[in-house]
């Protein structure tokens, strides 16, 4: 029974911290895995050109969906702080208003994605051969942006509601839906990239609509959906708090576009396909760190709101050690699995397989420091300091990485592209440490 009674107000041991964050970690990993399934089916059943096309437009798709991460993480920090201050009714109203705002914004962005997809595909560097698949896949997937955003929002709010296991269940349900429909639409019906896009969109509906139904009905969680009018101040505060998550998403997408541009210039279509494989695997590995950050953030926000300084120190100290252990473990695992994972995606093409395996063994060193940097950004989001969180995220995912992608190939050739992300993580680690030291007296976590 003790394992089922963890509350935001508790003192967290290593075991309790891991148990509380495990559902969100599993949720993010499973979300990443079922996203990877699209790539596996498209690469193996449709071909490497459609696979490259999907990878080319994916950064744009993720930018739109990233708005949901911004609202979810920033809104959860605000709502959890209100709960810590004992303002239950205001927490309900803020939660409800943010869900309504997500629905409205998602509908607008869905329309924008559908209308602009041909121009976006061409801007991203799609070749004539890739263009039809880019537009077809992109238009279908962005049509479901409203559902994607809702899914991302509820992933965070389930934790603030003290229902992380229910969040995991919803994610698994969405993932199984995507996997089954991918197999049916691509392997059986032979619908190609359209099948992959439809499968993804329908799975996002499962992930976004099921939580909506749950929170609309009487439930045992800390949060309820109530009639609510849009209020500018909490919307701006939530978006400000979560701006680092949006910045990370946008920056990663922009850098992804830069990677693709450099690879098309230096290697060609095979380079984009190899990078796509690295991104799919990175999604899964980094999802562990993101899941921990999402899972622990409401705890940090609650204790910040309650002014429990000793618990903030405890959470930071334990989290830093867990991120270090996770970084070493994932780096070793990535080195060992480089060849098998590359073979799984592109084993049908010997030269592409060799390129991907080589790139993987250079790329994997980035996992050593990624966890700490992701947690540091999320930690400041949880403290309702969106500016510092966004600065860490912006420098890590855009400035340092974009600079490395441009400069390192000049010094190291093509290998410089694969080393770029590790270079960015090293610089981000330094910046994260500086901010933690500078802000220690304000938040009393050291």
Feature-to-residue mapping (PLM):
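Hydrophobic/aromatic residues in alpha-helical transmembrane segments
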Residues: 38, 75, 116-117, 154, ...
């Amino acid at each position: 029974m003790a394992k089922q009674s963890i509350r935001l107000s508790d003192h967290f041991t290593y075991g309790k911290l891991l148990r509380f964050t495990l559902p969100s970690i599993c949720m993010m990993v499973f979300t990443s895995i079922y996203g990877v399934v699209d790539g596996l089916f498209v690469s193996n059943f449709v071909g490497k050109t459609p696979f490259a096309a999907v990878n080319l437009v994916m950064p744009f798709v993720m930018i739109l969906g990233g708005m949901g991460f911004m609202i979810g993480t920033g809104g959860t920090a605000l709502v959890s702080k209100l709960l810590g201050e004992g303002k239950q009714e205001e927490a309900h109203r803020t939660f409800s208003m943010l869900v309504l705002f997500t629905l409205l914004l998602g509908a607008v962005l869905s329309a924008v994605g559908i209308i602009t997809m041909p121009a976006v595909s061409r801007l991203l560097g799609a070749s004539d051969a890739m263009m039809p698949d880019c537009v077809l896949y992109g238009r279908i997937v962005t049509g479901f942006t409203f559902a994607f955003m809702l899914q991302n929002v509820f992933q965070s709010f389930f934790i603030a509601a003290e229902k992380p296991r229910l969040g995991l269940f919803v994610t698994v349900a969405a993932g199984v839906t995507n996997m089954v429909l991918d197999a049916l639409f691509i392997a059986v019906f032979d619908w190609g990239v359209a099948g992959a896009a439809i499968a993804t969109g329908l799975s996002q509906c499962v992930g976004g609509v099921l939580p909506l139904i749950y929170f609309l009905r009487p439930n045992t969680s800390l949060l309820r959906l109530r009639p609510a009018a849009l209020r500018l101040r909490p919307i701006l505060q939530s978006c400000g708090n979560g701006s680092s998550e949006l910045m990370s998403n946008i920056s990663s997408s922009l850098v992804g576009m830069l990677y693709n541009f450099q690879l098309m210039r230096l290697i060609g279509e095979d380079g984009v396909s190899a990078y796509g494989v690295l991104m799919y695997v990175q999604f899964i590995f980094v999802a562990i760190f993101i899941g921990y950050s999402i899972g622990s953030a409401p705890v940090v926000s609650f204790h910040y709101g309650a002014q429990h300084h000793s618990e903030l120190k405890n959470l930071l100290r334990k989290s830093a050690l867990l991120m270090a252990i996770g970084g070493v473990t994932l780096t070793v695992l990535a080195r060992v699995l480089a060849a098998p994972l590359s073979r799984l995606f592109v084993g049908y093409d010997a030269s592409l397989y060799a390129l991907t395996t080589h790139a993987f063994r250079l790329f994997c060193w980035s996992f050593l420091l990624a966890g700490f940097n992701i947690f540091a950004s999320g930690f400041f989001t949880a403290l309702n300091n969106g500016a510092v969180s966004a600065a860490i995220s912006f420098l890590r995912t855009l400035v340092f990485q974009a600079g490395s992608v441009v400069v390192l190939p000049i010094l190291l050739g093509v290998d410089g592209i694969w080393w770029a992300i590790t270079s960015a993580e090293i610089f981000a680690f330094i910046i994260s440490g500086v901010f933690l030291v500078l802000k220690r007296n304000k938040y009393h976590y050291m």
